Amino acid sequence: MKNAYYIGLMSGTSMDGVDAVLVDFSGAQPQLIASHTEAIPSHLLKGLQRLCSPSTDEINRLGRLDRNVGELFALAVNNLLTKCAIAKEEVIAIGSHGQTVRHMPNLEVGFTLQIGDPNTIATETGIDVIADFRRKDIALGGQGAPLVPAFHQQTFAEVGKKRIILNIGGIANITYLPGNSDQVLGFDTGPGNTLVDAWIQQVKSEPFDRDGAWAASGKTDQDLLTQLLSHPYFSLAYPKSTGRELFNQAWLEQQLSPFNHLDEEDIQSTLLDLTCHSIARDMIKLSNEGELYVCGGGAFNGQLMQRLAALLPGYTLNTTSALGVDPKWAEGIAFAWLAMRNHLGLPANLPAVTGASREAVLGGRFSAK
């Protein structure tokens, strides 16, 4: 059977690098051929972080960063192909998520904005690019997120098995696969790694809390946890999605101001519990028991996994590697899949998940010619 190669590009709210994956979709299940992470240079990272907070001269900065991120994504593709020695002519298309700089679907005129110019990626790689996956769903009245549940359904659903796929990046999202004819559901539960990363970066200048070791050295403050969990987002009904617009460093500092007597490691422990409790609450609303499979950066945080297991005694807990998909690359593979769906003219959103009025083919194609 002829190979069906697609490349997926993903940079999430954590902004911890650009993940590039080469995937073969010619078989029954996606096959990961090669993977590569391109580090985000510090000057570009600072520019992106500034752009995520409203300020002046935004349009000029947006235009520059759009090109810069496109160049970085193209570099990730070219390095990926060098690594696996596959010619660009063999790749059908690149699916690029881009870098989200605003996600505000709940305004009167909702919108989402990802940058990373697909024209730049196409011209610098010589491969057609499919990008701008979220805005069609928003145009149809949806949240534009999460988009991965359709991929999870096709890849992980099994009749008779009640499964939840939990993706923990900067933001955490879940996909509920009921194992029967009931609707697949999915939504963002709230912060994933974004607040624990922000706190350790602020206090220790470390990029992330490796294996949750710093959180494990602290003790959760129940009063602070209760206050954090009182954020209105946690009581919203789905479909719902969120991002740095709600859960960011400024919000965190505001929440911490009455708690400046707490030790720094106790705050870290509490922030990790915020992630775990908000996930567990939403999961228990869907079902008290089932199979839980975790992907994304959070899957490699032993302390996070341990706390989740304690909060969810009715669930068996594993990573998506048990289902044949490496948890580190799952989201990149999903965007390669979204590119394939666009190329084949097939819908890729789930209206029950996003709230869109109908299914739709997502993304636009940007030719390399």
UniProtKB/Swiss-Prot annotation:
The keyword Kinase applies. The keyword Transferase applies. It catalyses: 1,6-anhydro-N-acetyl-beta-muramate + ATP + H2O = N-acetyl-D-muramate 6-phosphate + ADP + H(+). GO terms for molecular function: ATP binding; kinase activity; phosphotransferase activity, alcohol group as acceptor. Its EC number is 2.7.1.170. SUPFAM superfamilies: Actin-like ATPase domain. It is an enzyme of class 2 (transferase). Pathway: Amino-sugar metabolism; 1,6-anhydro-N-acetylmuramate degradation; Cell wall biogenesis; peptidoglycan recycling. GO terms for biological process: 1,6-anhydro-N-acetyl-beta-muramic acid catabolic process; amino sugar metabolic process; peptidoglycan turnover. InterPro entries: Anhydro_N_Ac-Mur_kinase (IPR005338), ATPase_NBD (IPR043129). ATP binds at G12, T13, S14, M15, D16, G17, V18, D19. Keywords: ATP-binding, Carbohydrate metabolism, Kinase, Nucleotide-binding, Transferase. Belongs to the anhydro-N-acetylmuramic acid kinase family. Catalyzes the specific phosphorylation of 1,6-anhydro-N-acetylmuramic acid (anhMurNAc) with the simultaneous cleavage of the 1,6-anhydro ring, generating MurNAc-6-P. Is required for the utilization of anhMurNAc either imported from the medium or derived from its own cell wall murein, and thus plays a role in cell wall recycling. PANTHER family: ANHYDRO-N-ACETYLMURAMIC ACID KINASE. This is Anhydro-N-acetylmuramic acid kinase.
